[in-house]
């Protein structure tokens, strides 16, 4: 009997979230590139979050921002995103802080900090002292110190010195790059990959790693309980990063909606199901539906 190859199921191209929302009872939504661009929020995305929350279930913002959720909320609000269009925020920065709190529980943690001073509140209140590489027990990578002008290769000497001492890097943002307005900037994930290439040990917090999805689903369940609804059984993950948002959703067993005009915008043309499927195969990530931008 001849072997018959099953047909490839192409992703569904949709014009808005309303076309598939009824199939889901919770939304796990990326932030940067989906609901804001690092400068201002996307009103159509905010409306989509409102509508889903009103009609179908809780909305949890899941971000690889290297900040605690309260700081992420302040930032999102400053960009114009209404805080009542979502139920909770789960951040990689919050998860990384929890790790450092455990490491600093018994004695002062000597930490080599890689990131801008504006993100230092992430470790405020912990028994941590910033230290040079020769004294540090662990390194925290939040991002480049000046992501507007620097690139990861400028950190080669620093990373080699860390590797020589066998320092573990805690990466609070696994994203490689991100859009800020029209610019593409490097994130802490790029530093982490460079450190791994040297043989260094990296502990990642955030997407695509499973624990952050467990935290997001737990937050969705709490929000549902507070609204006297059943715990979500059919959550949908939304994001524009194939290696983080979509691959992470796949690993967590969640259906995914890919936002095509985000970080991969230049790679998503022509905008056809066949091209999207080839893009998914190239990145090893799969979304069941695709839309250009998040809207209802």
Segments predicted by a language model, with ranges:
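Asp-based, Mg2+/Mn2+-dependent phosphohydrolase catalytic module
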Residues: 2-31, 36-57, 62-65, 70-90, ...
């Amino acid at each position: 009997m001849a072997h018959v190859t099953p047909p490839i199921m192409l992703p569904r191209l949709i014009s808005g979230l309303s076309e598939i929302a009824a199939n889901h009872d919770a939304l796990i939504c990326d932030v940067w590139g989906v609901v804001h661009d690092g400068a201002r929020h996307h009103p159509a995305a905010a409306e989509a979050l409102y509508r889903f929350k009103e009609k179908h279930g809780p909305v949890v913002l899941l971000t690889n921002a290297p900040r605690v959720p309260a700081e992420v909320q302040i930032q999102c609000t400053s960009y114009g995103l209404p805080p009542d269009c979502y139920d909770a925020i789960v951040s990689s920065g919050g998860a990384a802080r929890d790790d450092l709190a455990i490491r600093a529980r018994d004695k002062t943690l000597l930490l080599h900090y890689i990131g801008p001073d504006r993100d230092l509140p992430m470790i405020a209140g912990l028994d941590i002292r910033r230290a040079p590489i020769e004294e540090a027990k662990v390194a925290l990578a939040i991002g480049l110190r000046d992501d507007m002008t620097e690139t990861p290769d400028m950190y080669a000497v620093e990373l080699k010195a860390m590797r020589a001492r066998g320092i573990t890097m805690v990466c609070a943002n696994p994203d490689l790059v991100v859009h800020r307005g029209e610019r593409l900037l490097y994130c802490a994930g790029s530093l982490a990959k460079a450190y791994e290439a040297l043989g260094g040990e990296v502990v990642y917090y955030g997407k695509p790693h499973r624990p952050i999805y467990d935290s997001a689903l737990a937050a969705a369940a709490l929000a549902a309980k507070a609204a006297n609804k059943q715990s979500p059984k059919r959550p949908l993950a939304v994001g524009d990063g194939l290696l983080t948002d979509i691959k992470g959703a796949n690993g967590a067993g969640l259906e995914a909606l890919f936002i095509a005009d985000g970080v991969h915008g230049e790679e998503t043309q022509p905008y056809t199901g066949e091209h999207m499927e080839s893009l998914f195969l190239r990145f090893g990530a799969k979304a069941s539906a695709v839309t250009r931008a998040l809207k209802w």
